[in-house]
C-alpha cells in the first residue's frame, strides 16, 4: 500500500511536471504567435503605406511627364505654327479659343491628379488644337500638318511615360533604399550623411559643409601610414576615390535595377515578405568598409600610442611626420568616429533592404566572385593587412567576409572604450548584426559562430543599456539554431552569467525604468525559448555558476515587474502593461521549472529571500485574478508558495 501511494505521488508529480512543461511550450507558442501577429500587422500597415506612397509617386510622376510633354509640344507648336499665328492672332480674332490645359505647361499646379485623370493621362493625348467648329479657314492646311506631327510626337511621349511608370512601380524597394541613404542626417543628433562620405577627401578645403575640420589631415596621415606599411595603400586617396565612384555607380544601379528575389539567404527565413536582391547595393560596401577600416586603424594607433607611453615613439607618429602631416591619435579617433557611425548606419540600411548584401557578407566564397562588377578586388584590398591587431579569435576565420571581420573588430574595440560616440558605434554595430541575423535563413545562422568570441565584451557592466538590449535580441535570434544555442553557456565567459549579473546589479544609472523593463522582458523570453527548444535546458543543464545566478535574476525581475504592475493599479490597459503581465506570467513558469529541476533551488533562493517572500503572495493574487489564468499557472503558484515556507528553514539555520 505504501509503495502504491509513493508510485501514485510520483506519477502525479510527473504528470504535473509534464503539464507545466506543456504550459511553458504553449505559452512560448502563444508568445511567438503574438509576435508574429504583431509583425504581420506592422508589415500590412507598412505595405498599405507603401502602396499609398507608390500611388502618389506614380501620380506625381505622371503629372511631371504630362507637364514635360506639354512643354515640349508647346515649344514645337510655336516653332511650326509661327507663320499662321502671325496672320490670325487670338487677340484680334475672339472666335479662336485656345485650350490652356492642352497647350501650356501648368507650372502652378501642385495637387495630385485623381485616378480618373491619371487614367486619362495614360491614354494617347490629343493634339494641341482650337475648339472644333471655330477653326478659321486661314492656315487650316498648316494646322492639319501640325496636328499629324503632334499626334506622333505625343504618342511617343505617352509610350515613354508608360514604360517609366512600370519601371518605377517595379523598383519601389530601390526607391525606398535610396531615400533612406540620402536622408540628412542619417542618424538623429549627427550632422553627417552619405553625401559627406561621397564628398570627403584631403583635397577639399577644411570647414566646408562636406568637409569637417581635421578630416583632411587625418586622412592624409592615415594614407601616409598605409602607403608606407603596405604595398597597395588601403587608405590612400586613390582608394577613397575608387570607393566613392563605386558608390555613385551603386546609386544608379539601385535606382534602375528591378527588384529580384532569387537566391538570397533571406529566402525561406523568418521574414513575412521576401527580401529584394538589389545587387547594385553591393557597390556601397567598399565605401562603408573604407571608413570603418580607417576608424579601426586609428583605434589601433591609439592603443599602440598608449602602450608605448609617449605618442612620439609610436610608428604612427613617425610615419605621419614623414608624410608632413601632424595628427594626434586621439584627435584622429574622435574625428573618424562620426564617419564610422554614419558608415554603419548605411550598412544597416543595406542589410535591411538588399538580399545581395546579406548574401555577400555571409558568403564564405571569395568576394571577387560574389560582389561582381569589378568591385571584389577593392573589397579585399581594403582589408588585407588591417586585422593584425584584432582581438584573438575575431580574425581567425579566413572564410569570413572582410567587412564582417572589420565589424567584429570595431565591436570589440568599442566595447572596451567609453564616450558618447563610442556608445553609438557599439549600438550601430549591434544593430547591423541583429538585422543581418534577422534577414537570413536558419541555414546561414552558423556563420555567426564568430560573434560569440566578441559578445562577452558586449555584456560587460560598462555597456550602456540600449546596447545590452540589442545584444540580447541578437542572442535570441542565434538561439533559434540548435548548433548555436548550447554556446550561450559553453565558453569560459558564460554569456548567460554575464547577463544575469548585469540585470541584478543594474550598472547603467542613466537608463529609465521602461528601458530596464524592456531588457528584462527580452531576457525572460530568451530563457523561455531556451527552455522549450533544448531537451536539457541551458538554464539548468550545466554546472556553471549561472545555475545559481538564474534563480536570483528571475526573482529580482519578478519582484520589479510585480512592483511595476502594482504601481499602475487595476487591470492592464496599455500594450506595455499587458506585455509586463505576460512577462510576469512567463517568469513564474520559469521559476517553477527551475524549482522542479534544481535540487538546490531552496538554497539558491536564500540570498533573495526577502524579495521572494514579498513578491509571491502578490504575484499569486494577481495571476489568479486574471480571467485567462490556466491550471498550470495555478499549480505553479501553489508549488512556489509552498516552497516559500520551505525557504524559511535554511534561513533560520543560517541565523
UniProtKB/Swiss-Prot annotation:
UniProt keywords, alphabetically: Coiled coil, DNA damage, DNA repair, Nucleus, Phosphoprotein
Main localization category: nucleus
Record GO terms (molecular function): K63-linked polyubiquitin modification-dependent protein binding
UniProt PTM comment: Phosphorylated by ATR.
Cystine bridges: none
Source domain of life: Eukaryota
Residue ranges of the region described as Disordered: 120-157, 307-327
Locus of motif EEXXXDL motif: 633-640
Coiled coil location: 6-82
Comp. bias intervals (Basic and acidic residues): 138-157
Biological processes annotated in GO: DNA damage checkpoint signaling; DNA repair
Localization per Swiss-Prot or TrEMBL: Nucleus
Gene Ontology cellular-component terms listed: nucleus
Bias kind Polar residues: ranges: 315-326
Transmembrane segments: none
The UniProt record lists the keyword Translocase: no
InterPro entries: ATRIP
Record text about domains: The EEXXXDDL motif is required for the interaction with catalytic subunit PRKDC and its recruitment to sites of DNA damage.
Role description: Required for checkpoint signaling after DNA damage. Required for ATR expression, possibly by stabilizing the protein.
Family: Belongs to the ATRIP family.
Subunit: Heterodimer with ATR. The heterodimer binds the RPA complex and is then recruited to single-stranded DNA. Interacts with CEP164 (via N-terminus). Interacts with CINP. Interacts with ATR.
Protein name as annotated: ATR-interacting protein
Organism: Macaca fascicularis (Crab-eating macaque)
